């Protein structure tokens, strides 16, 4: 008995479904698994560098110490050999002598031992010009100390300390400007090929002039009033 509107029989439907199941079973496993299989990268796997292999320790790992005494013994075995007291003293003495020698050479003005800001013939010439001149800038430290002691010793003079300090600073500023201009002109005459700015040369000269003579580094190589060519 046929139903209205039905073109295929029930038996034909069963056969069609069996054929579909058979065709799906005949597909390869790679297609049936779908996205579970990753496609090849197209390039070889990157290997570790030789340096990593050299630094990688091979072999069994040493177990951790179980007690504090084992930990102390392991640290003692891994520690470098200790130097005797006489060897340590000799090393300290040699290091101290080397530092002293380098400082003496720097204070003497040897070019190889000077800091970068003091190296060069231009800087040496500026130092000689400043050291041969009596500068008002060098009076800042002793004058400040004297004014400080007077302030604490005689409180009644505190009203006069501020104006005195302002006058001292003004004199120092004027002296620094005069010194910087003079140094720049003399450097241009002696070193025509100098490319360093006048501002930096003036600051270098003023900074050295503001220090006390015995505290200058390197120590002065000329006397007061000497002629510097």
UniProtKB/Swiss-Prot annotation:
TM spans (from-to): 137-157, 159-179
Keyword annotations of the record: Cell membrane, Membrane, Transmembrane, Transmembrane helix
Gene Ontology CC annotations of this record: plasma membrane
Pfam families: DUF3043
Principal location class: membrane
Disordered: region residues: 1-102
Residues in coiled coil: none
Transmembrane found in the keyword field: yes
Compartment(s): Cell membrane
Membrane topology, from the record: Multi-pass membrane protein
Record field: compositional bias (Basic residues): 73-94
Database matches in InterPro entries: DUF3043
Name used for this protein in its record: Uncharacterized protein ML0869
């Amino acid at each position: 008995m046929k139903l209205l509107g039905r073109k295929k029989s029930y038996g034909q439907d069963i056969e069609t479904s069996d054929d579909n199941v058979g065709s799906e079973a005949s597909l390869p496993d790679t297609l049936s698994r779908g996205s579970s299989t990753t496609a090849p990268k197209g390039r070889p796997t990157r290997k570790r560098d030789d340096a990593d292999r050299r630094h990688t320790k091979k072999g069994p790992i040493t177990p951790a110490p179980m007690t504090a005494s084992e930990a102390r013994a392991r640290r003692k075995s891994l520690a470098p050999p200790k130097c005797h007291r006489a060897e340590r003293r000799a090393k300290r003495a040699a290091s101290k002598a080397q530092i002293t020698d380098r400082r003496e050479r720097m204070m003497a003005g040897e070019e190889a031992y000077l800091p970068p800001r003091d190296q060069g013939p231009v800087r040496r010439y500026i130092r000689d010009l400043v050291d041969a001149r009596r500068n008002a800038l060098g009076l800042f430290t002793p004058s400040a100390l004297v004014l400080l002691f007077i302030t604490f010793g005689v409180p009644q003079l505190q009203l006069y300390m501020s104006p005195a300090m302002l006058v001292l600073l003004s004199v120092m500023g004027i002296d620094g400007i005069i010194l910087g201009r003079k140094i720049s002109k003399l450097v241009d005459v002696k070193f025509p090929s100098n490319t360093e700015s006048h501002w930096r040369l003036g600051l270098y000269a003023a900074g050295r002039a503001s220090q006390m003579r015995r505290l200058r580094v390197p120590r002065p190589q000329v006397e007061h009033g000497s002629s510097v060519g």
